[in-house]
Curated annotation (Swiss-Prot):
It comes from Pseudomonas putida (strain ATCC 47054 / DSM 6125 / CFBP 8728 / NCIMB 11950 / KT2440). The gene is rpoA. One of its GO terms (molecular function) is protein dimerization activity. It catalyses: RNA(n) + a ribonucleoside 5'-triphosphate = RNA(n+1) + diphosphate. This is DNA-directed RNA polymerase subunit alpha. It is an enzyme of class 2 (transferase).
Length: 333
């Protein structure tokens, strides 16, 4: 069918090329001329500045009073150790801040795997090197890991109370974003006789705590929510008060079918009226194991799939289900 030159095109072809577990290339076409850069730049800025993540924000090392110190028997100085701590890829399931400990002595390499973890903390890059010890070396430290968004300088977190007890507690500039690299190119596209169209190719790499495809979805959702205010824009002279629900992660509103579980696991969940991911994460392991025909193998599968999306069982949602999620929707989920 001939497409009119006056018809405003919307993208009809989306291709996701998985380069590695942490990198993907997403192609979107066709786009009207100029929209490749418009959308590419907007998504790039959101991905770099607005993706939530976790990072080490404070370190307390035995025998160290300030970052310009050196530790006997440790090859790296304190500044190098702090820089290495910034490279940790950490996921917190259900908490906004935790304190972790690391203790090692004797000759060898200190890696992220040497950090003692709580049950709801995961380090995606356990082979990441933190320091190298000589035979007489020892490294003992406490690490504070927090959840945040974007980039946060250390001095922005300090209060008057912190100033009085900051000796030995080393503050780190924190880059919370799970996005390591984002680039986009705009190529030519063609639809029938129209040759002046755009094709947007996004090359995205994360630190492994967030799937690249999910990062794109979240960035697009943020952009959509911000632009929604302009859709119903009116020239009212009086300010309009908009009642807004507490923000809920869009992934929680998606059906459990999107998790691509085995048929057995999916059917067991639906038999328990678990239709949405938000329903699922509020269940505990004990509750799920009471589900008929759902055994430990299915439970492990569910936990692994949730963990790959930064979620876990036993999480608490204060405003679930949201008003926008109607009960009769579940009948068709």
């Amino acid at each position: 069918m001939q497409i009119s030159v006056n018809e405003f095109l919307t993208p009809r072809h989306i291709d996701v090329q998985v380069v590695s577990p942490t990198r993907a290339k997403i192609t979107l076409e066709p786009l009207e001329r100029g929209f490749g850069h418009t959308l590419g730049n907007a998504l790039r800025r959101i991905l770099l500045s607005s993706m939530p993540g976790c990072a080490v924000v404070e370190a307390e090392i035995d025998g160290v009073l300030h970052e310009y110190s050196a530790i006997e028997g440790v090859q790296e100085d304190v500044i190098e150790i702090l820089l290495n701590l910034k490279g940790l890829a950490i996921k917190l399931h259900g908490r906004d801040e935790v304190t972790l400990t690391l203790s090692k002595k004797g000759s060898g390499v200190v890696t992220a795997a040497d950090i003692q973890l709580d049950h709801d903390v995961e380090i995606v890059n356990p082979d990441h090197v933190i320091a190298n010890l000589a035979s007489n070396g020892a490294l003992n430290m406490k690490l504070t890991v927090a959840r945040g968004r974007g980039y946060e300088p250390a001095d922005s977190r300090q209060t008057d109370e912190d100033e009085s007890r900051s000796i030995g507690r080393l503050q780190l500039d924190a880059s919370f974003s799970p996005v390591r690299r984002i680039a986009y190119v705009v190529e030519n596209a063609r639809v029938e006789q129209r040759t002046n169209l755009d094709k947007l190719v996004i090359d995205l790499e994360t630190n492994g705590t967030l799937d690249p495809e999910e990062a794109i979805r979240r960035a697009a959702t943020i952009l959509q929510q911000q632009l929604a205010a302009f859709v119903d824009l009116k020239g009212d002279s009086e300010p309009v008060v908009v009642e807004q629900e507490d923000e809920i992660d869009p992934i929680l509103l998606r059906p459990v079918d999107d998790l691509e579980l085995t048929v057995r696991s999916a059917n067991c969940l639906k038999a328990e009226n678990i239709y949405y991911i938000g329903d699922l994460i509020q269940r505990t392991e004990v509750e799920l194991l009471k589900t008929p025909n759902l055994g430990k193998k299915s439970l492990t599968e569910i936990k692994d799939v949730l963990a790959s999306r930064g979620l876990s069982l036993g999480m608490r949602l204060d405003n679930w289900p949201p008003a926008s999620l109607k009960k009769d929707d579940k009948a068709t989920a």
